[in-house]
Amino acid sequence: MKVAIALTDQSFQRTKSMGIFNVSMGLAKGLMNCPEVTELHILGNNECGDAFKDCPPHVHVHLTDKPVPRRFARVWWDQFGLCAAVRKIKPDWVILPKGVPPFFPRFGKAKMACYVHDVMWEHYEQRSAADRKGPFPWHELLYFRNLSLRAMKISDLVLTHTQFNASRILHYVPQARIARIGIGYDDTPPAPETDSPKRDVLTYASTFPHKCTPLTLQRISAWLNTREDGKDIRIHVVGSMPEELALPNAGWIHHARIPYAELRTLLREKCRMAVYFSDYESYGMPPVECLLNGVPCVASDIPPIRENIPAQYLFNNADEADFIAKANAAYDKKSPFICPEFPTWQEVCNRCVQAMLQH
């Protein structure tokens, strides 16, 4: 089977979703080792192309001399450039890991598989206008809403991860052909620590309103105030801070976007617990990454997170006492550490290939 996968719009520095970036890269790397894929064409750029050096002979990387498309160039690539590139390759299947298909041009005879990560536009349409402000201009939200619905309707195969997200796709397009292939991880959890000297806590920040950064700072501050050792606990905040917010004091350490290898080191060497607040997720990768690095992560109790994270780590966003109780239990190791089993990227890509072969 001859497969093309489009990564030209992927950038670690510029992406608004690290989850989508990680899934895109994981799929491309995993497909290399699927025996059914006899020829793999990766449409890359001069940033993500660096991750695909020294590939096997059946893997071909294209367009690595081009920059990541942005704004109008991104729209032009989505609608015309991608189609032209795919028609030259003439694959059996083209995979769009960002889930953004063109409106009109076709890929020749190639079948199309779109990875639909979320229905986030649905969530933002339901928020009040005052609460909707964020990195989504109205025209961008409308553009991706329409392309997301088109992906659900015209894809020969819709790839996704959680049962929650699959149910939202079927709500809008009951006839969608869905393969729930999941998300892969290649980390092996370290041995459980019974008496860890680590004291730090890791949490996340974002300019996206649904990531609840103000609530995150408020709840963690309240938790610290209840503990005798609260002044000795450092809080690592990973991600982009909203402009109107400042960290409470010098005990809070801000990290901008960091590579996963650096995050992994931070978790394994310094952190005793992680905290993840969110109003909306389609999956929720950060809590899983924390567990796979041996760090309990207390997280918002919403349906997609509930599919992957043990109940002992879940709290009600609206209940401060519940958060404090769950945080204390995790930090003080009152219950045995639990890390469910998660598929590797190779297993996820095998599922993807089998689904394509069946269609």
State where each predicted segment sits:
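Carbohydrate transferase catalytic cores enriched for Leloir-type hexosyltransferases
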Residues: 1-359
